[in-house]
């Protein structure tokens, strides 16, 4: 689950109270227990730099490091049907990019206060996930 700009991976529990909300939903029988992984989306090439956030680098980190580590530790079963991804605001951009580039990894998606920018990486001739030429790939991902 990806947070919004200026927040961190702990914002879901400190500000959003996700742990309390999810515990209550489980207790009421509205959802089944699951493991929620929250990563820090404020990823840059160099720590403390004034450079823009690098959503491509975050996507690579999620796919190559975070998901395999979580799979190993919590044994989700390694299947798309056992994984989903969600994001708030800036995290919705990161979620959209990741699910569009890796539809084989996720079966569920949540976009909260979301937006999709065509010019996300400063390339007006590319779509929201960096593909060229621009096409409505973000809509295709929801089919």
Put a short name on every predicted segment.
Residues 1-143:
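Non-catalytic cap/lid and distal C-terminal segments of serine-dependent acyl enzymes
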């Amino acid at each position: 689950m990806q947070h919004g700009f200026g927040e961190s991976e702990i914002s879901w529990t400190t500000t959003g109270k996700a742990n309390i909300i999810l515990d209550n939903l489980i207790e009421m029988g509205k959802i089944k227990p699951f493991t929620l992984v929250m990563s820090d989306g404020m990823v840059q090439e160099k720590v403390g730099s004034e450079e823009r956030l690098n959503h491509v680098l975050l996507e690579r980190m999620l796919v190559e490091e975070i998901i395999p580590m979580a799979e190993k530790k919590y044994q989700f079963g390694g299947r798309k049907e056992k994984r989903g991804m969600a994001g708030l605001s800036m995290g919705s951009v990161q979620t959209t990019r990741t699910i569009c580039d890796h539809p084989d990894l996720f079966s569920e998606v949540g976009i909260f206060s979301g937006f999709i920018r065509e010019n996300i990486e400063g390339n007006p001739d590319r779509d929201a996930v960096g593909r060229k030429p621009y096409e409505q790939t973000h809509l295709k991902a929801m089919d």
